[in-house]
Amino acid sequence: MAAADPFLHLARPLGPVAVGSAPTTAPLNVVIQPQALFSILDHSLRRNADQERVIGTLLGTRSEDGTEVEIRSTFAVGHTETTDQVEVDMEYQKQMLALHLKANPKEVLVGWYATSSELNTFSALIQNFYSGQGDGTFPHPAVHLTVSTEPGKDIETRAYISAPVGVTAERAADSAAFIPVPHEIRYGETEKSGLEAIAAARDAEERAANLFTDIEALERAIEEVLGMIDRVSRYVESVIDEEAPASTALGQFLLNALALAPKVEPADIERDFNNHIQDVLVVSYLANTIRTQMELSNRLATAQLTLGGESGSTESGQRGGQRGGKGGRGGQQRNQERSGEEVRA
């Protein structure tokens, strides 16, 4: 990464600028987000078998003074490259850039990437296109990010900017001096957790990783911290016993880490932890009580509806029976009257 790069980077104005305009300063640092790097690696895996490298566009943000560039997202750009010429689908690049800028108005064009560490004449042509006026990054220099994706080797990333080279305009169009700039891959706690979950499936046969619950994740984190503390303790003991060479940088780092620890007594920590556990238990008890009351009220309401339906059907049956009895008595009276009339006759 940037700390291991064997060069000294000095910020300076780059390229010819218009009269009366402020000079543009080269970026002092390039920050790469993990999602952008994963997108580049995915593009490399999906390339054709006859392609040595693939290229694409880098999108991100730039600080107000231009000293730091953050690469947040990328998209692939089709190109055909031979030993004699290179063809890049510029129209597709312009349309995709317009769509990305509409979806993410805070991002801007910052440069381009290639999945090869080689810098040649074709790289200079593409670099001049991305750093040109109009659809390029002008007046800011375009960042060229190279990512080596050779199988069986570690992934190496390098960042460059360019300066114009050539006496004539025709010669300068296909020439550029690439200047390396410091860069780093920066990720937060969320990205780190995701990367650790993905890395856990590296040695598994099914190539899948199980996601842990919050309690399991907390337990694993505590175990990792305890392991780090044991390793640091063994190192300090070995330095004290003169079994290992002392490191001033490591000692300063450990001193700064210990200075961040809060000055709290163990008894206070235990008391606060117990109070927190009691609060959690109270909340859990109240939640279970509310759940039980809701279930009980639902059951009572269902029982009332069931009993009300049964009593209504019974009453309607009794009323129907009473109406039937009345109808029977009326029929008997009519029969008796008819028999009396026949006797009189």
From Swiss-Prot:
Record GO biological process: formation of cytoplasmic translation initiation complex
Note the Gene3D superfamilies from the entry: Cytidine Deaminase, domain 2 (3.40.140.10)
Compositionally biased intervals (Gly residues): 318-331
Q: Which residues form the MPN domain?
A: 30-166
Supply the Pfam families for this chain.
Answer: JAB, MitMem_reg
Q: Where is the composition biased (Basic and acidic residues)?
A: 335-345
Tell me yes or no: is Oxidoreductase among this UniProt entry's keywords: no
For this UniProt record, give its keywords in alphabetical order, as a comma-separated list. Answer: Cytoplasm, Initiation factor, Protein biosynthesis
Give the family per the record.
Answer: Belongs to the eIF-3 subunit F family.
* Name of the protein in question: Eukaryotic translation initiation factor 3 subunit F
Which species is the source of this protein? Answer: Aspergillus terreus (strain NIH 2624 / FGSC A1156)
